[in-house]
Curated annotation (Swiss-Prot):
Coiled coil: none annotated. It comes from Pongo abelii. SUPFAM superfamilies: TATA-box binding protein-like (SSF55945). GO terms for biological process: acrosome assembly; DNA-templated transcription initiation; dTTP biosynthetic process; spermatid nucleus differentiation. GO terms for cellular component: cytoplasm; male germ cell nucleus; transcription factor TFIIA complex. GO terms for molecular function: RNA polymerase II core promoter sequence-specific DNA binding; RNA polymerase II general transcription initiation factor activity. Part of a specialized transcription system that mediates the transcription of most ribosomal proteins through the 5'-TCT-3' motif which is a core promoter element at these genes. Seems to also mediate the transcription of NF1. Does not bind the TATA box. This is TATA box-binding protein-like 1. InterPro entries: TBP, TBP-like, TBP_dom_sf.
Length: 190
């Protein structure tokens, strides 16, 4: 097994966060009274609205800024944001769907081997930091992609990046580094 061989790694996207604007003022009290699946947080000045399909949660401010979380793809996030804008239009607001942007993607990837974290950190010191007393994972930052990876000794990697493409590229870039710090599999023969 070498680092150059093509290994199919499954990258599971667990959360996509997007933001958009409505270009109109939103009456939070009206949304709370007439909307479905809403929680009015008056002390904070926002409304939480949940959609069932796609399964997303939106944080709505009176300024018209809306943050949607919980989608599992960029397409699903946009579809959910549009459904949310449509439901606000049905409540009587003059909503115009603008400034849609995916701001964060969280994904999980499992390597087919375990990783020696102290060795990995020593080999990649400027980008990697490992504090086993504080957190069981190595924090590895790729500034060019604006991605952060949490690398666990079990081979599980949690990736946070600005979009799905950056997350996939980050996993491709990290694979050779974690491969050289992999744990050897011991085989017992009798």
């Amino acid at each position: 097994m070498d680092a150059d061989s093509d290994v199919a790694l499954d990258i599971l996207i667990t959360n996509v966060v997007c933001v958009f604007r409505t270009r109109c003022h939103l009456n939070l009290r009206k949304i709370a009274l007439e909307g479905a699946n809403v929680i009015y947080k008056r002390d904070v000045g926002k409304v939480l609205m949940k959609l069932r399909k796609p399964r997303i949660t939106a944080t709505i401010w009176s300024s018209g800024k809306i943050i949607c979380t919980g989608a599992t793809s960029e397409e699903e996030a946009k579809f959910g944001a549009r459904r949310l804008a449509r439901s606000l239009q049905k409540l009587g607001f003059q909503v115009i769907f603008t400034d849609f942007k995916v701001v964060n993607v969280l994904a999980v990837c499992n390597m087919p081997f375990e990783i020696r974290l102290p060795e990995f950190t020593k080999n990649n010191r400027p980008h990697a930091s490992y504090e086993p007393e504080l957190h069981p994972a190595v924090c590895y930052r790729i500034k060019s992609l604006r991605a952060t990876l949490q690398i666990f000794s079990t081979g599980s990697i949690t990736v946070t990046g600005p979009n799905v493409k950056a997350v996939a590229t980050a996993v491709e870039q990290i694979y050779p580094f974690v491969f050289e710090s992999r744990k050897e599999i011991l085989s017992f023969t009798t």
